[in-house]
C-alpha cells in the first residue's frame, strides 16, 4: 500500500486531498499545524524541518499543501510559511528518500497576464489570452512570488537529487455554493471565478493522478482548473501528462 502524507490537511484543499486517498489503495497521513476535532493528524509547524523529517518517515510521497493561501499576504507571512515551510517539505522528502513531492502551486504564478486591476489579484480582464504552463512567470502578489520560489526549489531537488516533483498551479478552489456567491461580486471578479474554478471533485481526481501518474518530465508543472467554458488556462499538459479528466464546468453551475 502506498503511503502518502498530506500537509495542510485541515484546509479546504487539504481535506479534499485527504479524501482523494481514502479509497483503500493508500495509507494517508494528514499533517496539520494544530489539532482538529475529528481528525487524527500529525501536528507540526512546517518551518520545523526536524519535525517534518520525522513526520515523513516511511512514506512514499507527500502532497505539500500547507501555506498561506492569500494573495494579500505580506512578504513576512509568505517568507515564513510558504517559502521556509516549502523548503522544509523538500528537505524532509529528500532525507526520507521519498519518490515524489506534489507541490500546491497557484494560478497566481501567472496572475498578472490577464489581471483587470493590477492591485486586485483576483480580477479578470474581459478579453483574456490563453495561458500555458511554459509562459514566462508573471506573479500578481507576494503569494504568487512564493509559489514561483517553491517551483524553483522543486526544480533544484528534481535536477540535483532526482526527487520527482509535480507542480499543480491550482485555480480557484470553491464549492458550488461558494462559486454562486462570487457572482454577486463585481463583474471582473465573477469572470475570474467562472474562468478558473476548480471543483472539489476535480481536485480529488487531479491530486490522486499527480501521485499516481508516470511523469514524462521532471519536474512537471501543470495548470489545474475544471473544464470551464470560459477558462483561459490550458489543460492540455494536465490531460496528456497526468491523465486528468475534468467532469465539471462552472457554466453548468451558474
Describe the function of each predicted region.
Residues 2-24:
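N-terminal Rossmann NAD(P)H-binding glycine-rich loop of SDR-like oxidoreductase domains
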Residues 105, 151-176:
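Conserved beta-loop-beta element that borders a ligand/cofactor-binding pocket
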Residues 142, 146-149:
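Active-site helix of classical SDR
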Residues 183, 219-245:
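Conserved C-terminal active-site "lid" loop/helix of NAD(P)H-dependent oxidoreductases
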Amino acid at each position: 500500500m502506498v503511503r502518502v502524507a498530506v500537509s495542510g490537511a485541515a484546509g479546504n484543499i487539504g481535506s479534499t486531498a485527504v479524501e482523494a486517498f481514502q479509497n483503500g489503495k493508500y495509507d494517508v497521513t494528514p499533517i496539520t499545524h494544530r489539532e482538529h476535532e475529528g481528525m487524527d493528524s500529525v501536528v507540526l509547524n512546517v518551518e520545523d524541518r526536524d519535525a517534518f523529517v520525522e513526520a515523513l518517515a516511511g512514506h512514499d510521497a507527500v502532497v505539500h499543501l500547507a501555506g498561506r493561501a492569500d494573495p494579500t499576504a505580506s512578504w513576512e507571512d509568505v517568507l515564513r510559511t510558504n517559502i521556509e515551510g516549502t523548503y522544509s517539505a523538500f528537505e524532509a522528502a529528500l532525507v526520507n528518500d521519498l519518490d515524489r513531492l506534489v507541490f500546491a502551486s497557484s494560478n497566481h504564478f501567472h496572475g498578472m497576464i490577464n489581471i483587470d486591476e493590477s492591485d486586485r489579484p483576483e480580477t479578470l480582464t474581459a478579453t483574456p489570452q490563453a495561458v500555458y504552463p511554459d509562459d514566462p512567470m508573471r506573479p500578481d502578489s507576494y503569494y504568487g512570488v512564493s509559489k514561483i520560489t517553491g517551483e524553483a526549489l522543486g526544480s533544484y531537488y528534481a535536477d540535483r537529487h532526482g526527487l520527482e516533483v509535480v507542480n499543480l498551479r491550482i485555480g480557484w478552489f470553491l464549492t458550488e455554493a461558494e462559486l454562486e456567491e462570487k457572482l454577486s461580486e463585481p463583474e471582473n471578479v465573477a469572470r475570474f471565478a467562472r474562468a478558473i474554478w476548480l471543483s472539489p471533485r476535480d481536485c480529488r481526481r487531479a491530486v490522486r493522478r499527480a501521485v499516481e501518474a508516470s511523469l514524462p518530465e521532471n519536474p512537471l508543472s501543470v495548470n489545474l482548473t475544471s473544464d470551464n467554458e470560459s477558462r483561459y488556462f490550458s489543460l492540455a499538459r494536465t490531460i496528456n501528462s497526468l491523465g486528468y479528466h475534468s467532469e465539471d464546468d462552472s457554466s453548468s453551475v451558474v
